[in-house]
Amino acid sequence: MSEPLKPRIDFAEPLKEEPTSAFKAQQTFSEAESRTFAPAAIDERPEDEGVAEAAVDAALRPKRSLWRKMVMGGLALFGASVVGQGIQWTMNAWQTQDWVALGGCAAGALIVGAGVGSVVTEWRRLWRLRQRAHERDEARELLHSHSVGKGRAFCEKLAQQAGIDQSHPALQRWYAAIHETQNDREIVGLYAHLVQPVLDAQARREISRFAAESTLMIAVSPLALVDMAFIAWRNLRLINRIATLYGIELGYYSRLRLFRLVLLNIAFAGASELVREVGMDWMSQDLAARLSTRAAQGIGAGLLTARLGIKAMELCRPLPWIDNDKPRLGDFRRQLIGQLKETLQKSKSSPEK
């Protein structure tokens, strides 16, 4: 059987027409107005950037002043004059067969060549230290990018710079975890979780060892001058060691520059973090009762060495910190206190025997 037809439905009001978007009228600029047209300035300053980060970033990328350009131009002109005068002396000595003067010109050429080679080597190492900041910025962009094609080559370059062999287990796990459908953010993130912790663990061990040596040296040494010289020497060794672990070869000027950047970073951001992390344990009555004055000074020196190593690690590291993987000063503090207590107990028990 067929179903009966439905009754007709009458609407009281007519159907409403769908609103259509009206296009704006065309706006044209005259030639005079186009000359005075200027795009609006967009403030792209990151909100999370603090004073310390801005200061370190400005130190890493210094602006070339007029005086610096004048000094560099004067040095270049002086070098060209020395080379030209040396060539003229050599030609005159050859024409007059003045062999003594010719030998002096040859010795001067060797000295100038050695000096130029040293300057070029120092400049290359200093440029490599500055380039690490650009690599860290590039890694930060890749960690927020959804593009494809740059992440794998970037991570392979970082592994090569750090001296990680292709047969390393961590690098093999990274190769097994990546595939063609992943974007740059995922590939760099896998590298940060699988390969980068290998270098970070070595840097942490170096920081712990150097901090413990500084703590014990200050705690047992009676001479303040020896303490200062020892701490300065060990801190420089620590910076060199961390830079080598992350594939940065330091020269004289690049070493001074890194040391200055580390001290600058500590001066801006270190005091508040040091007070926050050391805080209650440092002011604890129990700790003050158990440790002597020299032991407390040793812990302070060890904490400063650890802080120096953490900041050097942050400046030499090719990737930014993610997922709260930054080393904390509290971890080294507990380790230093434990080692110092163990050493003091051994020193007290040895005379009794």
Swiss-Prot record:
Superkingdom to which the source organism belongs: Bacteria
Lineage: Bacteria, Pseudomonadati, Pseudomonadota, Gammaproteobacteria, Enterobacterales
HAMAP family: UPF0283
InterPro entries: DUF697, UPF0283
Gene, per the UniProt record: ycjF
GO CC, any one term: plasma membrane
Record key words, sorted: Cell inner membrane, Cell membrane, Membrane, Transmembrane, Transmembrane helix
Pfam families on file: DUF697 (PF05128)
Membrane topology: Multi-pass membrane protein
Biased composition (Basic and acidic residues): 1-19
Stretches for region Disordered: 1-35
Location (main, coarse): membrane
Source organism per UniProt: Salmonella agona (strain SL483)
Family: Belongs to the UPF0283 family.
Subcellular location(s) per record: Cell inner membrane
Transmembrane segments: 70-90, 100-120, 213-233
Name of protein: UPF0283 membrane protein YcjF
